[in-house]
Structure formats: structure tokens, C-alpha cells
């Protein structure tokens, strides 16, 4: 069994820490990776972080994860509400999937309240800031270890 967890991030998350810090905070995607790697290492796992502004690139990473990852943490960002392609790719992945959002999407515009990804996710975290990623990694570690 692989002990790698894929952490996939969608559009505009490359600007984390710069774009709308009042919503998303001041920490960067590099901070997310560092914090998640530390949590995973405590449990004997590793992480592979990927970000793209392109839907097909995210789908390709999910396909790769079928062979290379025990679980996926995904923040599809705007694709949460629009991407059947990402949902279909996740449906082809057999391991656990946790959907993670930095902000509380249910407290924001109504179009953000619907998630295609939630139809596949084993759990959803929203509104915990980047700490949500750490919580998601802990849960994936537990699920991958049989818990």
C-alpha cells in the first residue's frame, strides 16, 4: 500500500495569502504543504501537493493518484460548483477523498452552496482556514490505515 496523500488545489489557490486575505487568510500554499507534510509524517505518510488553474490538469492528477496515492484531499475551488469532469475522475479513485474549503462556503454566495465533489467525498471540511487541510490529512491517514 502506498502511503502518499495527494493534496489537490484548484483555480486561484496559487494566490493564497495574496488574494482576498480577509476571506482566505495570509498563509500561502507553501504553508499548507509544510503543515500537511508535518501532520502526515507524524503518521508515517507523505504528501504530494498540486495546484492548477486548469480543470484537465486536476483530472490528470486524480487519474495518477489511482496508482500512486492512498487518499486525496481536494480543494477544487471554483470547480467545486461546476465540474462533473472532476467528479467523474474522483469516482474512478478507490481510496478515501476529503473535500476541503478554506472559507465557509455555506456562509457565502448561494452559487457556492452546491458541490459536485461532495457527491463522492467521504467527508467535507469548510470554514476552518488552512487548518482544515491538516484535519483532512489526519482523517485520510486514519482511513488509509484502516480506521
Swiss-Prot record:
Keywords from the UniProt entry: Amino-acid biosynthesis, Aromatic amino acid biosynthesis, Lyase
One Pfam family this sequence matches: DHquinase_II
Pathway this chain belongs to: Metabolic intermediate biosynthesis; chorismate biosynthesis; chorismate from D-erythrose 4-phosphate and phosphoenolpyruvate: step 3/7
Biological-process GO terms, alphabetical: amino acid biosynthetic process; aromatic amino acid family biosynthetic process; chorismate biosynthetic process; quinate catabolic process
Binding-site residues, substrate: 75, 81, 88, 102-103, 112
Domain of life: Bacteria
InterPro entries, alphabetized: DHquinase_II, DHquinase_II_CS, DHquinase_II_sf
Catalytic reactions of this protein: 3-dehydroquinate = 3-dehydroshikimate + H2O
Site features described as Transition state stabilizer, chain residue numbers: 19
E.C. numbers: 4.2.1.10
An annotated Gene Ontology molecular function: 3-dehydroquinate dehydratase activity
Record: active site: 24 (proton acceptor), 101 (proton donor)
Membrane-crossing segments per the record: none
Complex formation: Homododecamer.
PANTHER family named in the record: CATABOLIC 3-DEHYDROQUINASE (PTHR21272:SF3)
Function noted in UniProt: Catalyzes a trans-dehydration via an enolate intermediate.
Protein name: 3-dehydroquinate dehydratase
Gene source species: Cereibacter sphaeroides (strain ATCC 17023 / DSM 158 / JCM 6121 / CCUG 31486 / LMG 2827 / NBRC 12203 / NCIMB 8253 / ATH 2.4.1.)
Gene: aroQ
